Regions:
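Bacterial Sec-dependent N-terminal signal peptides
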Residues: 1-24
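Glycan-recognition and catalytic cores of secretory/periplasmic carbohydrate-active enzymes
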Residues: 20-406
């Protein structure tokens, strides 16, 4: 109990002053920091007995200083982010040692292309790892893993509902006959990619159907999102919306809205259908207008205890990355505003208030995984680091006059 109370004191102490954070952003210096932390993580993972490439960094809790690792299994949805961090770090540094480590960690996920789908997280698992690996190396074996995994993900699609079943494991325990979570929007990118890179063209149709049904059923009239949409498998109709990892079913869970912003940016990129661009801006505006001063959201926009509620750096990193891409699809005024907002978010994440610095080998502090389950509260979490370094690389490309998507 003393440990829990102490942790809460740390959380509340941070939150009370976090809104005063300010800073500037030197993108190369920020990427250098990420490179240093990545090397530090690899040294730590090696230890005395060498690296176990099946064990992936997942989190570092508030009072800890070393990665908690989890085995790369079909159930461990975050296992693709650490290989993805290594690929992004290699993209920046061109360090051959980092390339070798990225390849070894990525190889631990190949089995996912050969087994039935456990849930929708195959995109996070395989596209963050093998997707980035193929983008940077054009290894044909990587391409085949992605194509095979996309076909596996497609087996969860229900044509009556029109979406992918996100959590098969929750169908009976929660009486959620067909459930679709907002996180699932991110995994559509792998389907779009596969459809235009030698996979079944039907994968494109699945992604579009999923995006359309989610747009219709998983948002409130004010464009805030539900985390989970529960559907009837016979009629395909919506039964209810649930905010499983947020504060309440009526509130805007920060990372859920972040997934929506990122996901619909990808859908517009792949379809060029203006309805998605219009919708995307509405979803983005309701997020931006409710942010605190430093542009890093509370874990839920209606969380109890605001302004002392914990922030979620992971949501800020996801949105910053998405906005940098979205800014390139919009006229100068709106596009510039979104780009500037993304830079403000990254500047805050680049500050002492959010960076791990010498205290931990992660990039960022202060993310919230699952508050209602008392899990990963005010922690360093690997997906925050993944989207942070992705956003920095996107900003660097923009500053160099290159396409934001490489």
């Amino acid at each position: 109990m003393k440990k829990i109370v102490a942790g809460l004191v740390v959380v509340l102490g941070f939150c009370a002053c976090a809104h005063r954070t300010s800073g500037t952003l030197d993108v190369n210096k920020a990427l250098d920091y990420c490179a240093e932390q990545t090397q530090r993580s690899l040294v730590e993972l090696k230890g005395d007995s060498g690296i176990d490439y099946t064990m992936m960094p997942r989190n570092i809790m508030t009072d800890e200083h070393h990665w908690n690792c989890r085995k790369a299994t079909k159930e461990e949805w975050c296992a693709g982010f650490w290989p993805g961090v290594l690929w992004y770090d290699y993209e920046y540094t061109q360090d051959k040692h980092i390339l070798e480590e990225a390849e070894k960690f990525t190889a631990s996920l190949e089995f996912l292309s050969r087994i039935p789908a456990y849930d929708h997280d195959l995109g996070f698992l395989v596209f963050c790892s093998y997707g980035n690996g193929y983008r940077l190396t054009k290894n044909p074996a990587y391409k085949q893993v992605i194509l095979d995994t996309a076909d596996t993900l497609a087996t969860l699609f229900n044509p009556i509902v029109g979406t992918i079943l996100s959590w098969p494991r929750e169908v009976e325990p929660r009486n959620w006959p067909h459930n679709t979570i907002m996180d699932n929007m991110i995994n559509l990118e792998m389907l779009f990619w596969a459809a235009k890179n030698g996979g079944n063209p039907y994968l494109y149709d699945i992604a579009v159907s999923h995006a359309d049904k989610t747009m219709k059923c998983q948002f409130r009239p004010d464009y805030t999102s539900y985390h989970v949409a529960v559907y009837d498998t016979i009629t395909g109709n919506l039964i209810k919306g649930v905010t499983h990892q947020g504060y309440a079913d009526s509130t805007m869970w920060a990372r859920g809205q972040a997934w929506a912003i990122y996901g619909y940016t990808v859908v517009y990129r792949e379809t060029k259908d203006p309805k998605y661009l219009d919708f995307e801006q509405k979803v983005t505006e309701v997020y931006l207008e409710r942010l605190p001063e430093d542009k890093v959201p509370y874990w839920d926009f209606s969380a109890p205890g605001i302004p002392d509620a914990p922030r979620d750096a992971s949501a800020a990193a996801v949105v910053a990355s998405a906005l940098l891409e979205l800014s390139t699809y919009l006229p100068n005024g709106t596009g510039k505003r979104y780009k500037d907002a993304a830079i403000e978010m990254l500047a805050s994440l680049n500050s002492d208030s959010y960076q791990s610095g010498k205290s931990k080998p992660s990039f960022l502090l202060h993310s919230v995984g699952h508050w209602p389950a008392h899990s990963e509260i005010d922690a360093s979490i690997i997906y925050a680091d993944y989207y942070y370094i992705e956003a920095l690389l996107r900003l660097k490309r923009l500053q160099e006059g290159k396409n934001v998507i490489k």
